[in-house]
Amino acid sequence: MKNLFNFFKTSSELRLAYRLLKQINQKRSFYGAMTDFDLANQTNIFKKRLANGEKLKDIRVDAFAVAREATKRILGKTPYDVQILGGLILDMGSVAEMKTGEGKTIASIPPVYLNALLGQGVIVSTVNEYLAERDAEDNGKVYNFLGLTVGINKTEMDANTKRMMYNADITYSVHSELGFDYLRDNMVFSAAEKVQRGLNFCLIDEVDSILIDEAKTPLIISGGKTNLPAQYLSANQFVNTLIAEDFYIDEETKGIKLNDKGIDKANAFFGLRNLYEIQNSEIVHRIQNALRANKVMKRDVEYIVQDGKIALVDQFTGRIMAGRSYSEGLQQALQAKEGLEIEPETKTLATITYQNFFRLFKKLSGMTGTAKTEEQEFIDVYNMRVNVIPTNKPMIRKDERDEIFATSHEKNQAIISEVERVHKRGQPILIGTSQVVDSETLSEMLNQKGLYHTVLNAKQNQLEAEIIAKAGRKNAITIATNMAGRGTDIILEPGVTELGGLYILGTDKAEARRIDNQLRGRSGRQGDVGISRFFISLQDQLFRRFTNFDQIFGAYGQTNGAIKGKYIHAVLLAAQKKIEGFNFDMRKTVLSYDDVIRQQRDLIYAQRDILLQIENFDHYIQKMIIRAVDIILNYDFIILPNQEIHYKNLINFLNDNLSRITHFNFGQIGIENYPIEQLNEFLIKQLETIYFKQIQSVLKENLGKTYFESERYIILSTLDSQWQNHIDTIDKLRSSANLVQYSQKNPYQIFTEEATKKFNILVAESAYQAIVSLFNNSNAEKIEYIKAILSDGTAISYPADSPQEIIDQIIASNEERIAAARKAKEEKQPEFIEKQLAKLKIEKVESGEEFELWKIGDSKLVNLKKEMPLDEKQNILVKMQQEQLEMMSEEEKNLIQEQNLEIVEIEEIEEEIQNENPQKVEFVDFKNDPDAYNKLIFGADYADKQLISSEEEDNNEKTNINNNEDLERTKGEAQQTAKNPNE
């Protein structure tokens, strides 16, 4: 009966997973008998099955069995049945709750492998880069064996490297970098610049930390700095004049605002009539930040000061959030409070919350040690169920009842006494704190007792994983924030089990039971023994904020030692549930506000993607002209209150804003003749004609086929600028939503209405500003060019309005290029001459001390002085070759002549000279120029060289004439052969 009851308690997903597990286990022997080659080749078989139309669920059992066998062979670890169960839940797009030490990393291998087979990319998101690198390296061995590629995405990588990492089959990355890459991808001006591909499947490690604890944290890319330190300093100075009676703090929400006394002081301090008039919203914003920084936020709790900078502390992990800062002026308010240099405030350029980013994935799943208490939120926000996976071995850790004391001092004394007691027998103890200041207080008390210990908090987090891993050694005392070292197993040193295992001592309750369970879960992994206990005081934040503190403290505040009785424990549990509900509501509120922005962001980003793909913007420009004209004709200085048109203002406006490039005079087209009902259509046609007939035609002339890239850049940059202004305005609108509380309206309703109005303005204003920029596109200016002739006879062109120093630089650089080419030609001349002689069957066969022996043709040899210049040798050798030709019979002469003609065909020589020296080659006319052959061999200035005697010139001229006659005959025969190929 008990088993039947447990069966019905089990979710439908987990019941399906059990059935699939049975089938996977049946495949174990089949795949276990395969060779490594055959096992790895299953990846190709699976891909073919998917290509033939099968779905992932059709190959799931086989793929899981293959991944299990590969893990066994490569890592030497056979995944337990519970790990396969966890993997199946992950593949179903749900959350798998697996206790600490149950092997979540191994459990992720089969579902990641299966989903990577689609070839659309799988992303594994982790909480820090250490875990990303560790898991990518370990699990990557299995994936590589199975023929899949693995990438690691890191913060410091350039765009090209990131693109390679995302193009891998499986990509490991920190969650924050995934979101920032998404935002950056939607700020590029070319589709090729994007680094991410489609958001297909994401498996989130420590999913509760990312999707619950950090859900309210927006990812923000900032820019456009403005530096107004006086405003922050004056607000800080004002807040320091206030006393407790001047403002109200809500302990539950940590909200703070001025009361009537505070408002009167603000009016007097800033010289205002009414602080909350709309024109004073910026002052209100600064005061609100200064109040929060000075009266609510605590140093070494929410932030620390490190190297003269404000560093944020993650309230759930205790880690420093490197590279992050508060937005909307809060960072500057903290700097003013701490007397630090006030950095310029930045403008939000792009932003998204983790909630909305991860909801972009087609398929999402996650694993963690504790999530069941937040299941309803996972269902409502992410449509993910939470399934608790049973442990591989029974859990035998003892979770002792909380010890509750009246004061913090009593609690700390009891903690030190307990540490001394446990340490005496050598049992390792891990003390979990939620705040840096608490860890430092306990550390000082332990030092006073002479107890050696290690502290891990936001100030010492460099060796986090290493420190946590050593916490299981004998006599070890480790103080750490509750979530430090998450994802790192604490291995018990031999002999520690006999001492009772790892002792977990919590120093206060977290805002979620889930966080407390995470701390407990550091002990008792894989059936190990262990113990956990929490020490609490009535002065802890949980009691102060979420109970009737005065009543509780009045009843128990004088108690010595631990407070007994069930009631106080019930109050503690109720307070924890209350804050869980409060935080859930806060996250829902953040999500509801962000959903308004999300819908607008989706529209803008979808529009950007279209603009990145198309190459003809005419249709868009026509639409934008219509919107621009509509805006122009709604300006109150053009359309007067009586609906009359101020034509002069209209003409001046058009000439000032739309005529800089074309110098078009709108006063000469008869605008005054058109009444208001016809003016709109008339202006649209005029602007279309001006743009497409004048501006775009010049754009095409100047930029060629890629003219549209200039249009794309203008349209995108205008859209981005307007969007960035919009989200900056919306951020301020959201932060000041409480200013409408006196209007008896729902702040969210007011926010939604105002955000929608402002978005409509954004769309219209983007179109108008884009048209103004397109009509003033400097690339569309007509440019007159001047031609200059260089020393080699080539010409270059430059804009007529170029400064003289620029012209001189252009000419000088080209002359340097020409000189370098000439030098290169001279250096290659010997090689060129030898090459040409070789083609004429003239080659050097022997070289002595004074003479060189050259061979001409197949028989003739001649000795030449070694010191003779190569061009003189060339002259003599070619001349002797010509003489040899004259002494041959007509038949031999024709044969060699044909061979030579094949070698010195004009097209071949011209092409070769061009390759050797990219200068202009003059055409050599063999038919009409008797010196053509020698010009070809010796160069175009042959006539100026006196290389042979006049008598020899006469003989050479005769030879050239004979050669030309032979050439004509050969050409004629070649042409005849071309006409009659059979002959």
UniProtKB/Swiss-Prot annotation:
The keyword Protein transport applies. It comes from Mesomycoplasma hyopneumoniae (strain 232). ATP binds at Q83, G101, E102, G103, K104, T105, D489. This is Protein translocase subunit SecA. Residues 973-983 have a biased composition (Polar residues). It comes from the Bacteria. Belongs to the SecA family. Keywords: ATP-binding, Cell membrane, Cytoplasm, Membrane, Nucleotide-binding, Protein transport, Translocase, Translocation, Transport. It is found in: Cell membrane; Cytoplasm. Residues 948-983 are annotated as: Disordered. It is a peripheral membrane protein. The keyword Disulfide bond does not apply. Part of the Sec protein translocase complex. Interacts with the SecYEG preprotein conducting channel. Has a central role in coupling the hydrolysis of ATP to the transfer of proteins into and across the cell membrane, serving as an ATP-driven molecular motor driving the stepwise translocation of polypeptide chains across the membrane. Monomer and homodimer. Part of the essential Sec protein translocation apparatus which comprises SecA, SecYEG and auxiliary proteins SecDF. Other proteins may also be involved. GO terms for molecular function: ATP binding; protein-exporting ATPase activity. Its main location: membrane. GO terms for cellular component: cell envelope Sec protein transport complex; cytosol; plasma membrane. PANTHER family: CHLOROPLAST PROTEIN-TRANSPORTING ATPASE, SECA INNER MEMBRANE COMPONENT OF SEC PROTEIN SECRETION SYSTEM. Its EC number is 7.4.2.8. GO terms for biological process: intracellular protein transmembrane transport; protein import; protein targeting; protein transport by the Sec complex. It catalyses: ATP + H2O + cellular proteinSide 1 = ADP + phosphate + cellular proteinSide 2. PROSITE patterns: SECA (PS01312), SECA_MOTOR_DEAD (PS51196). SMART domains: SecA_DEAD (SM00957), SecA_PP_bind (SM00958).
